[in-house]
Swiss-Prot record:
Protein name as annotated: Tropomyosin isoforms c/e
Family statement drawn from the similarity comment of this UniProt entry: Belongs to the tropomyosin family.
Main location: cytoplasm
InterPro entries to which the protein is assigned, alphabetical: Tropomyosin (IPR000533)
Keywords from the named record: Actin-binding, Coiled coil, Cytoplasm, Muscle protein
């Protein structure tokens, strides 16, 4: 082979090598570009994921703040509800104690009222009995007064008779003793009537005293019954107010 041919062959071989290297370089450049694009895409995805994550973290932080605020408000409402519940429980306990006390007191008042009513009835019976006795004594007194009046009439008649007898004494001296005996008996009857009047008057005063005492007892017992009835009404009103307050508190708790 000639020198020229050798040089041409060497140049052709070198050109092929250069083309091959250029092709390889282009391929490597394209591969590097593709790799760079992939890396860029991955970086963009990572950036987007990071932004999304940051946005999600921010949203979660805002949500946490809202949840914390809601939790704080819930805790405040819970404290308020707990306080109201404690107050309602205390009020319910007080109302229950008041109810039991009122029931006991009402029972005692009812028993006392029954006892006082019994005493009032007994006092009324005593007063009625005293009235009957007073009427009976008054009737007997009227009878005694009538007897006394008749006795006075008889005494007056006796005195008239004595006058007549005294007039006749001068004529009928033998009848003097008989007339004296008649006069003595008349005086004895008069003394007996006066004693009966004193006895009846004493019994009448006693009956009047008992009647006054019975009337005062009835008035006193009636006042006591009225007072107990007023106290019972006040206790019932207090229990009704406590019950309304408890119901209102429970409604407020349920409304919260």
């Amino acid at each position: 082979m000639s020198k020229v041919n050798k040089e041409g062959a060497q140049q052709t071989s070198l050109l092929d090598v250069l083309k091959k290297k250029m092709r390889q370089a282009r391929e490597e450049a394209e591969a590097a570009k593709d790799e760079a694009d992939e890396v860029k895409r991955q970086l963009e995805e990572e950036r987007k994921k990071r932004e999304d994550a940051e946005a999600e973290v921010a949203a979660l932080n805002r949500r946490i703040v809202l949840v914390e605020e809601d939790l704080e408000r819930t805790e405040d409402r819970l404290k308020t509800a707990t306080s109201k519940l404690e107050q309602a429980t205390k009020a319910a306990d007080e109302a229950d104690r008041a109810r039991k006390s009122m029931e006991t007191r009402s029972q005692q008042d009812e028993e006392r009222a029954n006892f006082l009513e019994t005493q009032v009835d007994e006092a009324k019976v005593i007063a009625e009995d005293a009235d009957r006795k007073y009427e009976e004594v008054a009737r007997k007194l009227a009878m005694v007064e009538a007897d006394l009046e008749r006795a006075e009439e008889r005494a007056e008649a006796g005195e008239n008779k004595i006058v007549e007898l005294e007039e006749e004494l001068r004529v009928v001296g033998n009848n003097l003793k008989s007339l004296e005996v008649s006069e003595e008996k008349a005086l004895q009857r008069e003394d007996s009537y006066e004693e009966q009047i004193r006895t009846v008057s004493s019994r009448l005063k006693e009956a009047e005293t008992r009647a006054e005492f019975a009337e005062r007892s009835v008035q006193k017992l009636q006042k006591e019954v009225d007072r107990l009835e007023d106290e019972l009404l006040l206790e019932k009103e207090r229990v009704r107010n406590l019950t309304e307050e408890i119901e209102q508190t429970v409604q407020e708790i349920q409304g919260s």
